[in-house]
A protein has these predicted regions:
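Glycine-centered tight-turn and secondary-structure capping sites
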Residues: 54-58
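RNA-contacting regions in translation and RNA-metabolism proteins
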Residues: 1-50, 63-85
Length: 85
């Protein structure tokens, strides 16, 4: 049960970061897909906000993934971020 809560916390974290970056925060959604070893967080944003979430040369996306990785270490669980169109 603790891992589900951790996944939910990470989902909320990614959602909050993404909403701060985009022009249409109501279109942001994050879904957690639990696997055996990794929880995949699927981030969806409006098509015109996709570039803002990815950033120049993927820097913003890489930063979000780094935050996820660091927070996941505390929970002893791995998280990956997929940005979907």
């Amino acid at each position: 049960m603790a891992t589900d809560q951790g996944g939910g916390d990470m989902r909320g974290l990614v959602e909050q970061i993404a909403r701060a970056l985009v022009d249409e925060p109501e279109q942001v959604s994050v879904q957690a897909v639990d696997g055996e070893q990794v929880t995949v967080l699927e981030l969806r944003v409006a098509p015109n906000d996709l570039g803002k979430v990815i950033g120049k040369q993927g820097r913003t996306a890489r930063s979000i993934r780094t935050i996820l990785s660091a927070a996941g270490m505390k929970l002893r669980k791995r998280f990956t971020l997929e940005i979907l169109e």
